[in-house]
């Protein structure tokens, strides 16, 4: 659904800047929470993430643009799939900032070497706004033909690429 909405915003409404919907009413938040329940399974690569973090090969931080009202939902998901312990820190968008601006702020503050993101609009923003962090994009089926230097079909591929780069630089 993201592609048709983006086309309507750009070509019919003339909106060219990146902006995301922020649910405010109880109904909107309920529907938003329901939509995020669709993330029922972890990404392909979750086991590799568990292995790499438990062996201290990488230090992982979860930076999610999910809003504060989804915090319980997020922790239930992470606990259900034994992923919570993988992360040194978990940061939610508790101030309901625009997701791309929120992630830019957190990346600048934390000074990450690498950042993985699955939303093209956020990747496009971060890749020009944050130059000290290598932004990796985990693309979806609709966006697979976009050209981007560090794009991956799955979390697993992104992690493997980062590990190769870490070994080359050490």
Could you say what each language-model-derived stretch is?
Residues 1-36:
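Active-site neighborhood of HAD-like aspartate-dependent phosphohydrolases
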Residues 2-7, 11-12, 39-43, 49, ...:
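A generic "structured core" feature
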Residues 20-21, 29-61, 68-75:
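Short, acidic loop-to-helix structural element flanking the phosphoryl-transfer center
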Residues 47-48, 77, 105-106, 122-129:
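A short acidic, amphipathic alpha-helical/loop segment
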Residues 66-67, 119:
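Helix N-cap/beta->alpha junction signal
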Residues 68-114:
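Substrate-recognition "cap/lid" segment bordering the active-site pocket of phosphatases
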Residues 80-93, 148-168:
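Structural recognition of alpha->loop->beta junctions
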Residues 109-156:
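Acidic, Mg2+-coordinating phosphoryl-transfer loop and its flanking beta/alpha structural elements
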